[in-house]
């Protein structure tokens, strides 16, 4: 059981969430004013507490993904993945060669400040990262099978509000049935 963190921009909120019995938290950088510095501090505390932290970056691009991974975030919830090509680009940014094209930064939070042989670090990092692609448009669902088959995309989910908006059902009685239908397609 987890929750989204959207308004409380202090790492200490993680201690409260864990004390409340939650198993993980998601930080929303797409629709909230979190700075990279705050998220990096949250990542450090989450690692110290052994409390899984998921981050939704503002965009699923190399810049944001690299910065979050280098800060020690292992679970990404990537928004607006509409095509298999986008999914492949996201997956490539998240993993080192030979599985991807992630840039190498040798020592920091992402290595837990442990120096080890590069091949060992790369294999460990590739195994730890978990990438969820958010499907938020009709076009994404038209490419569902292609997106789902991209190596390195570990899970799929919907972005319910954006999807409802794209389908033209946001705020109408048709919203819930339309979203339920799209959720079933992911199972």
Task: Report each predicted region and the residues it spans.
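Expand to "…catalyze enediolate/carbanion chemistry for C-C bond making/breaking, isomerization
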Residues: 1-187
């Amino acid at each position: 059981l987890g929750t989204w963190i959207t308004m409380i921009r202090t790492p200490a909120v993680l201690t409260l969430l864990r004390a409340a019995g939650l198993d993980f938290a998601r930080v929303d950088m797409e629709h909230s004013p979190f700075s990279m510095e705050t998220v990096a501090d949250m990542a450090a505390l989450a690692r110290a507490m052994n409390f899984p932290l998921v981050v939704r970056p503002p965009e699923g691009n190399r810049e944001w993904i690299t910065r979050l991974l280098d800060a020690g975030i292992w679970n990404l919830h990537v928004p607006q993945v509409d095509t298999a090509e986008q999914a492949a680009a996201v997956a490539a940014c998240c993993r080192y060669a030979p599985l991807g094209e992630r840039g190498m930064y040798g020592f920091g939070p992402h290595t837990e400040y442990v120096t080890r042989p590069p091949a060992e670090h790369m294999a460990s990092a590739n195994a730890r990262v978990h990438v969820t692609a958010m499907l938020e448009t009709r076009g994404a669902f038209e490419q569902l099978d292609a997106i789902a088959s991209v190596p390195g995309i570990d899970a799929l989910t919907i972005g319910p509000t954006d999807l409802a908006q794209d389908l033209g059902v946001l705020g109408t009685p048709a919203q819930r049935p339309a979203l339920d239908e799209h959720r079933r397609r992911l199972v």
